[in-house]
């Protein structure tokens, strides 16, 4: 600042593992506060302009790549990712060795392509093969979606899911439109836009059941620190775990808790030389975000149920790969059938049909609502 003082603000970290940094607003003169506000506003303007340019470039490049492929549904059945996921590819195109999945947004002029997700086989340093999934640099991901199938005037039910492979499996199973939101955190903004566009459609979220988060945490600690992590029932200073490493003693805190109505694990880790614990919260993010989105839009949530949960499957694509597409169809049809019954009940209560007592109809509708909620 002009006074010589320093004021720190911003965000440190990547994605969800980020932390806001900002000085307290006390102890500053009116002139200093004004200078701080002006500096923050100017920095934000510069950032917003840089983001706008990146998104504009991404939109142009995405259109060029997408339009260079003659037809949709051109993804080869022998593509490594298609083979790995055991899917019938839909709603995407292939350019060379890369699968192109469109990132669309609703705009005043209709639907606009704003970016791409690319999926391709990559070679590691040791010569092994892996699958690389990336968003085209600068793509606007928040609120962006891909659609498998078509929404028409006759469409009554639309499914929503996180990933493209899951979307392909759901579409193959139910033959109804599927919206791909690309991430758990994007379910809510995408569903809000679709509900605004199609208020009369019934939306079902085919959620990822990320129930293995505690197992993954314990496996991560084991691989990094060679330590069998214990997760306690509640927080207690007497239950801090100490791990001896070549760099010194690492302090760990892990206990069960609740966040936004969902069970979670609170985890903290402090290494030699660190003044504070680095903290994070682990939970079934797929279910938590799906429920949050459903609450805002009166949608319903269904999670895959596995015969062998220990295999580590989380989504409906995993279910299809492990147990077959018929199992996926049966699980999803249970929710679809409940909606159809509810819709029939609603039509019977119309003014044109008064052959049934209104109170009986209301009881029937409430019964069907209960069926849907229990799925």
Identify the function of each model-found stretch.
Residues 1, 146, 252-254:
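Broad, structure-driven detector of short, well-ordered beta-strand segments within folded domains
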Residues 14, 82, 101, 162, ...:
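Terminal peptide-recognition signature
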Residues 74, 78-87, 96-99, 104:
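Serine endopeptidase catalytic core focused on the charge-relay Asp
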Residues 1-81, 210-212, 218, 344:
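Non-catalytic accessory segments of DNA primases and related replication-initiation nucleases
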Residues 375:
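Conserved ATP-binding/catalytic motifs of P-loop helicase motor domains
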Residues 50, 54, 99-199, 217-227:
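Phosphate-handling DNA/RNA-contact segment within nucleic-acid enzymes
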Residues 1, 91-94:
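Short amphipathic beta-strand and strand-loop transition segments with alternating hydrophobic
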Residues 156, 168-368, 372:
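TOPRIM fold recognition
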């Amino acid at each position: 600042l002009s006074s010589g003082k320093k004021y720190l603000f911003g965000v440190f970290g990547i994605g969800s593992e980020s932390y806001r940094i900002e000085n307290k607003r006390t102890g500053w003169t009116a002139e200093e506060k004004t200078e701080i506000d002006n500096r923050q506003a100017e920095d934000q303007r510069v950032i917003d302009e840089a983001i706008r340019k990146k998104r504009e470039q991404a939109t142009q490049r995405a259109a060029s790549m997408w339009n260079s492929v003659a037809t949709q549904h051109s993804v080869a059945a022998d593509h490594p990712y298609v083979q790995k996921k055991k899917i019938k590819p839909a709603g995407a195109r292939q350019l060379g060795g890369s699968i192109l999945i469109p990132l669309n947004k609703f705009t005043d002029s209709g639907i606009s392509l704003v970016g791409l997700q690319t999926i391709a086989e990559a070679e590691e340093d040791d010569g092994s093969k892996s699958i690389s999934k990336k968003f085209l640099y600068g793509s606007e991901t928040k609120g962006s979606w891909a659609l498998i199938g078509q929404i028409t005037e006759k469409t009554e039910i639309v499914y929503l899911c996180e990933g493209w492979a899951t979307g392909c499996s759901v579409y193959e199973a139910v033959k109804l439109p599927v919206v791909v939101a690309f991430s758990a955190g994007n379910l809510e903004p995408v569903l809000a836009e679709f509900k605004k566009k199609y208020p009369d459609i019934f939306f079902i979220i085919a959620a990822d059941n990320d129930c293995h988060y505690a197992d993954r945490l314990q496996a991560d600690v084991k691989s990094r620190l060679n330590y069998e992590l214990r997760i306690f029932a509640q927080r207690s200073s007497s239950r801090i775990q100490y791990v001896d490493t070549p760099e010194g003693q690492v302090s760990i805190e892990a206990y069960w808790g609740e966040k936004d109505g969902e069970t979670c694990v609170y985890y903290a880790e402090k290494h030699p030389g660190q003044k504070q614990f680095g903290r994070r919260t682990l939970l079934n993010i797929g279910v938590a975000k799906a429920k949050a989105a459903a609450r805002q839009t009166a949608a319903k949530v269904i999670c895959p149920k596995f015969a062998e949960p220990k295999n580590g499957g989380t989504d409906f694509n995993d279910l299809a790969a492990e147990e077959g597409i018929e199992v996926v169809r049966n699980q999803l049809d249970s929710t679809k059938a409940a909606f159809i019954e509810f819709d029939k009940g609603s039509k019977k209560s119309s003014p044109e049909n008064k052959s049934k007592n209104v109170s009986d109809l209301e009881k029937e509708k409430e019964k069907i609502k209960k069926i849907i909620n229990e799925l």
